[in-house]
Amino acid sequence: MTKIIFTQYLPLNDQFEEYVDYIENKQRNYALKYGATYALHTPDDIDNYDDLQLNKILLAEKYAEQYDQVLYIDFDVIPTDHAPNIFEKVNGLSLYPTYPKAGMKEYYKLIDKQMMLASEGCEYTDNIFNTGVFHCDKASMAELKFSERLDECRELCPKFNNEVYISYIIERYKCKHNFLSMCWNFILDGYQEIPNASGYFHHYHHKKFHLRY
């Protein structure tokens, strides 16, 4: 089985600057530990966050044609030394569902997704998939058809957000998917600030990389 872990980084946020080498080494060492190729993309034709987020889905589609298992992790995701082999734990399209409530920053994503589905006469859930960590393969990306359905998503919601769009597509077209356990996308933010042993991959939303487990 061929495997790849890929990520991408642009210096759009100076909070990363002094930790770039540390993060890359942690991600690369995790990939090598479990026999996966590691790829860090630094696209020079992208200069904004939205295009960077779109690019990771397009890259996943490309890699799914070349590798049996594809894992994307944001560059603010740091694997812990005790993290087991994720490739033995997940399969197909696997993402972590968040359940934002009113007043939370993520809540607006949920509302956009629900409005898109409602406009198509579809039922909807109360979650949004976080794409900071996701696993996929050729079959799951072929079913998702993200690139093919991008124009449809933009017509329904011109304000681009990759998590809104991918959540809409999964629900609208009933794409097969799996829920990624929280331990693989252990989000650190204003609610959970300090990394701990519960997480295998610590996702530093708050960018406080000096906080280590």
Give the predicted meaning of each segment.
Residues 1-67, 155, 159, 172-174, ...:
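N-terminal anchoring/stem segment of glycosyltransferases
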Residues 84-153:
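Conserved catalytic core of nucleotide-sugar-dependent glycosyltransferases
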Residues 27-38, 119-134, 168-171:
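A short, hydrophobic secondary-structure junction motif
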Residues 126-213:
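Catalytic core and acceptor-binding pocket of nucleotide-sugar-dependent glycosyltransferases
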Residues 54-56, 107-113, 193-200:
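Short, surface-exposed amphipathic charged segments that create phosphate/polyanion-binding patches used
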Residues 14-15, 46-49, 79-82, 86-88, ...:
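Short catalytic/ligand-binding loop motif for oxyanion handling, primarily in non-cytosolic enzymes
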Residues 5-6, 39-41, 71-74, 94-96, ...:
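A structural signal for short, well-ordered beta-strand segments and their strand-loop junctions
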Residues 52-109:
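GT-A fold catalytic core of metal-dependent nucleotide-sugar glycosyltransferases
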